């Protein structure tokens, strides 16, 4: 298992132990389970309907749209929300500080931040959060 997978699995186990996910979340009578599914990593599976096909055990190829919009007809024909990791990474900060604070970062036409992966023959490979509209590749 890759380091990132280990960290995600550990974080999910900690969330279950703390009562943030699972049955009767924090005594609210609301329950949700999260299942981690490690894909093969094919680029095309980044397209939401291809990801759903892969999760269903099929070849990870995009479905024809319409009528297959995941919010109405997704995993096993059920309504499905598909988010990328960058969207999910922004949620804790947004929920803590609010949309106005988030949109105050960056530029007027490109507010907020984004994640970028730097790899190859570079001095500091990794995943970085940058402010939209202000950082260049040279930086």
Q: Which role does the model predict for each range below?
A:
Residues 133-139:
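Short amphipathic, charge-patterned alpha-helical segments
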Residues 1:
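Glycine-rich phosphate/pyrophosphate-binding loops
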Residues 5-132:
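Hydrophobic alpha-helical positions that pack around
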């Amino acid at each position: 298992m890759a380091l990132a997978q280990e960290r995600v699995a550990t974080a999910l186990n900690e969330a279950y132990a703390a009562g943030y996910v699972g049955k009767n979340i924090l005594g609210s009578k609301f329950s949700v389970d999260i299942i981690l599914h490690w894909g093969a990593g094919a680029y095309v599976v980044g397209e939401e309907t291809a990801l759903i096909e892969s999760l269903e055990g099929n070849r990870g190829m995009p479905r024809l749209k319409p009528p297959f919009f995941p919010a109405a007809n997704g995993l096993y024909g059920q309504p499905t929300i598909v988010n990328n990791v960058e969207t999910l990474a922004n949620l804790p900060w947004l929920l803590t500080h609010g949309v106005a604070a988030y949109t105050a970062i960056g530029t007027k036409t490109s507010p907020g931040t984004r994640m970028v992966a730097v790899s190859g023959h570079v001095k500091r490979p990794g995943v970085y959060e940058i402010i939209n509209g202000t950082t260049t590749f040279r930086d």
